[in-house]
Amino acid sequence: MNFARNKAFLDVVCHQGNDFQIKDSFWKHLNDVTADWNEPGRFTTFPGYEWSGNTAVGGDRNVIFAEEGFAIRRCSHALLEDRSDADTDAHTISQLYQALRESGDNVVIFAHVGGRYADIHLDHDPELETAVEIHSDWGTFEWIARDSFRLGRRIGIVANSDGHKGRPGAS
């Protein structure tokens, strides 16, 4: 957070770790850190994660909560030893939308192009998924915006660093 605010001079930041690597203890820590660093009107922090389903089940999505305290809905527990809450996993993008709608969480989702590009043709929830990411450290992906417009979707456009180096805003 220090780099984001004091070096990259960002106004807004959200950590986006791969869900299948986020332990429950780290999720709690991340929520605590975002609450500690949030300064309304100066520096806004959001808790979030990257739902990291393979492209065939929906592909990467950035999940961003408006505030702390919401549950993480992973695509899997692939790299986690503790699987005690594996029954809460959302294995497909449709299951993620359903779980977030049913929970009433104050959340937005962005289709993300990274290691597992988001397949926006599979499913879409216009109330939850309000934007697509067209640029990150991984490149520029204008095609995802064009595909969204061809599908008749009204979307926002975002760009993120996603450099996995702990330096948000430095891409």
Named regions from a protein language model:
Residues 1-171:
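Extended, charged catalytic domains and RNA/DNA-binding interfaces, predominantly
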